[in-house]
Amino acid sequence: METSESTDRSQSRCLDLQPSSDGLGSSSDPFSSWDGRHRSALVAATAAASAAATAASTARAAALWTKSPAPYSHGNLLTEPSSDSLTERYTGPRFTHKISHGRLGFQPAYFSHIAWNPYTTNDLSSSRGPIPGSSSGPVPGSSSSPGPDSSSDPGPSSSSGPGGSPGGSGRGPGHGPGPGGGSGQGPGGGSGQGTDLGPAIDSRHSPGHGHGPRFNFSAPVGFRNPRGDLIPNYTGCKHHCHWEPQKQSWKFLKVSEPGARGLWKPPEVEGKSTVLSETLPRGQCLLYNWEEERATNYLDQVPVMQDGSESFFFRHGHRGLLTLQPQSPTSSCTTQKDSYQPPKSHCQPIRGKREAILEMLLRQQICKEVQAEQEPTRKDSEVESVTHHDYKKELVQAGPPAPTKIHDYHTEQPETFWLERAPQLPGVSNIRTLDTPFRKNCSFSTPVPLSLEQPLPFEPESYSQHGEISSLACQGGGQGGGGG
């Protein structure tokens, strides 16, 4: 916005400077006639004043340009030989094209310092203020050092030639120690001599006799006395050198405490940095939404230039983040100090370590000798398992048991399968001996006299007697039964 506004202002000013179609006189010149006597008297006075002002401004500009670098990116932008006038240089598509592409090293708003009143029509010779080129400050047209425009090429700001016609103008080779500087008689018979303003004023339309454009060239104080950082320096620069801003000379400061302290800064800069800078949130996605991050964001504020880098400022942690009393001093207790136990006995031992080791070895050796004398010598027994021991034992031959008496197979009943299974059968006679006949059990019905003389175990029964008794018992039983 500033560039467009300043461009419009410069175009409006330059359009006022354009001469009319009838001649070189401006349409805003209300005082067109002046007495020749007053003009010739003031020309001599202004010539002497301009010579003194030129010498003072040249010395002052030379002293300032040796200290300050050139703040412009293009030193010959306003002093191009191809530009004919101020109105042609700062109006039209070429000036707008340079502004839009960033050709200017400074903001075009600085052209507002060239104050020109179209109604102030004092003549060049009758002007009480400084004439063009005789400004009191170091302007770009009064350099005493050789510059890129100090050659004999025709410059847009210096001209000398005949100007006898009313409002006439001429161009000649510019020569001077500074860029755009030149000396010579102005057109229209003007005898004023002085250094030109360089890129600020074009001397092609310098005032003279006749109906030429006559206006006040006195620049305001802000333009006559610019700051030191706005004055160009053409000593070590070529025709199209790019200006680089002067860097502050930093000095490293050695710090005894751990951590990076950063670059050293002048004390006047450190005294101004008292405002805390608001740091951006640590995260860009999820960390920015965390409640803890927003709650502790004010603790991340670091003084801008006072305490150096952020890592050095937070080398002991965030202040007040883990305590309820931010101003309380840090506790001096540590885990190692709390767990340390001082030694109980500080006295020196009576005997040394070597003596204690020798005593222990002798004690062990004597114990082994005494134990060997008390215990008898043991033989080494062969390890033998139970299975191994039983395997070597001789087994007894298995066979039938020895007979208890002599058997007669003629009289004894043989052992058969049925005799062995006979007691298991129901309703079978009681087998008492091996020779008991196989018959039904009639023990419950045997008469008492028959059961008194029973044979002992392992004794043969008398079959004949038993048969007789049995028959008699049966007969008696039959008789008794029949008689009853």
Swiss-Prot record:
Domain of life according to the entry: Eukaryota
Sequence segments annotated as region (Mn 1): 332-345
Entry GO terms, CC: acrosomal vesicle; axonemal A tubule inner sheath; axonemal microtubule; cytoplasm; microtubule organizing center; nucleus; sperm flagellum; spindle
Coiled-coil parts of chain: none
Keyword Kinase part of the UniProt annotation: no
Subcellular location(s) of the protein: Cytoplasm; Nucleus; Cytoplasmic vesicle, Secretory vesicle, Acrosome; Cytoplasm, Cytoskeleton, Microtubule organizing center
Biased composition (Basic and acidic residues): 1-11
Region annotation Mn 2: where it falls in the sequence: 384-398
GO MF term list: microtubule binding
InterPro entries tied to this protein: Sperm-assoc_Ag8
One GO-annotated biological process of the protein: spermatogenesis
Keywords attached to this entry: Cell cycle, Cell projection, Cilium, Cytoplasm, Cytoplasmic vesicle, Cytoskeleton, Differentiation, Fertilization, Flagellum, Nucleus, Spermatogenesis
Tissues expressing the protein: Expressed in trachea multiciliated cells.
Biased composition (Low complexity): 20-32, 125-160
Job description of the protein: Microtubule inner protein (MIP) part of the dynein-decorated doublet microtubules (DMTs) in cilia axoneme, which is required for motile cilia beating. Plays a role in spermatogenesis by enhancing the binding of CREM isoform tau to its coactivator FHL5 and increasing the FHL5-regulated transcriptional activation of CREM isoform tau. Involved in the acrosome reaction and in binding of sperm to the zona pellucida. Plays a role in regulation of the cell cycle by controlling progression through the G2/M phase, possibly by delaying the activation of CDK1 which is required for entry into mitosis.
Family: Belongs to the SPAG8 family.
UniProt protein name: Sperm-associated antigen 8
